[in-house]
Amino acid sequence: MPPELQKRVHEAVEQARQRSGWPAKRTLAALGIPRRTYYRWLKEEAWARALPAESVKPVQPFEALAEEKQAVLNYARKHPELRHRELAWRMVDEDVACLSASTVYRILKEANLVCPWRRRSKLRRGEEEKATRPNQRWVTDLMQLQVGDGTYYFVSFMDEHARYIVHHELLLGMDGISTSLAAQAAIETLPRGEDGLPREKPEIQSDNGSSFIAREFLQVLQEHGLGHHRIKPHCPEENGVIERSFRTLREALEGEELSNLLAAERVLARLVRWYNQERLHSALGYLPPEVVYRGRGEERKEQRRRKLAQARHRRREKNLGLQQGSLPFVAEETVANP
């Protein structure tokens, strides 16, 4: 038998042993080759002398498939505003491509699609001071907006743990009555007990603005049994989570037409839905705030883990099949006459 075919038989025996656990005796019997002949081939290794050495690329079982790489590039071009980590988790959630963030980064870098990173200062606070569950602490603040020819005030109540905007309104003024009515509407979103009071009583955190120290605002909190914590004067970083959400919303408002109050309310309602339900938040492990607020965070993480594991398994099978052949045997007619 020519050395080339001897080599193919040897590769088939090794592959059958590695992939199926078959001993050489069983594989050789299936191929119709006497064991004595096979071991003589091994001793002589004629194929090693007859064939030039070939540089063989090591098999990378979990390398991203060509179709996965293309899917990443297509998705990245459709969403140039997303960075690689958020891009990776969005594609997992939407079943576009189940790849790790580091793999997505390498694919984008090879295609020169990685945006330069702008370092932003992080507003930090002690771990012991942070909320550890939904409805433990709400943060509130006002953001001034220009609508048409007038000035309005966007007030937001955000769950600190989940980064979920519980309630928002566009106010005509920043007086105590307006903010107290907004606070009442936010508190009404909480589930109630038999006594009519909220079953959960989040602490309300605000700055020391006149609207948040007004008698009307404090009275609403007291009526519902909610505590009030005011941050230190001139320390807006203590309200960092809501300040960051305002920056995100301002960026999203660029290019939007806020010609009148009704149009502005529609735009803000749409952006708040996007922020709560679609935007993946890095501090939440790239989960949408609503998923965490509703207590479905671990369920979503488990879905992601399962998708990644399944994709990894499929990738391994396909890569091994492409580089090693789908069957461990050579054609029977090529070895009929050893």
Regions found by a protein language model. Give the residues of each.
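Residue-centric detector for conserved, function-critical "anchor" positions
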Residues: 1-33, 42-57, 63, 71, ...
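Residue-level signal for the short linker/turn that defines the boundary of a DNA-recognition helix
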Residues: 21-23, 82, 99, 259
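Basic, flexible linker segments flanking DNA-binding modules
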Residues: 39-137, 235-236, 293-297, 302, ...
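C-terminal domain-tail junction helix/linker
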Residues: 58, 222-224, 248-338
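Mobile-element integrase/transposase regions
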Residues: 97-98, 102-158, 164, 177-201, ...
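Acidic/histidine-rich, metal-coordinating catalytic segments
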Residues: 193-213, 239, 287-290
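RNase H-like polynucleotidyl transferase catalytic core
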Residues: 200-208, 222-241, 257-261
